[in-house]
Amino acid sequence: MEDTFRHKGLRKKMVEDLLARVEIEGLDRQTVAEKKRQVCRAIEEVPRHCFIDTAFDSFAYQDRAFPIGDGQTISQPSTVLAQTVLLDVNPGDKILEVGTGSGYQAMVLERLVAKVYTIERHKEVNLRTKQLYTAHGG
């Protein structure tokens, strides 16, 4: 699926909203602020609409979860932001993600670290995600 100027604009707006709205506790304020900016830059690079069914394309950049098959969902962007900030990842880190799902979280993580290893137990979700992941630089 193409990443159009419309999608990029919606993604930029979503990131601005996430930066302003999402509060994260568990790390000191300065670290949280810095990590939020880093993670939001990574989120802005990943075309979320490519990781969901085209039926949801118009809603891809809302802070909502969407079904991806086999009873699984793609997490809402605020959840991806909070989880990733709290992981406190750094360049050169290696990440093991259990439960690949759509592959969106792994793509965000890959923008921040050297290597992401991810496994998925649902065969259909896994096959679809492998194709998406490869198509988008994973």
Q: Language-model segments: which ranges?
A:
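Alpha-helical scaffold segments in soluble metabolic enzymes
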Residues: 13, 82, 128
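Conserved nucleotide-cofactor-binding alpha/beta core module
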Residues: 86-138
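Class I S-adenosylmethionine
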Residues: 48-80
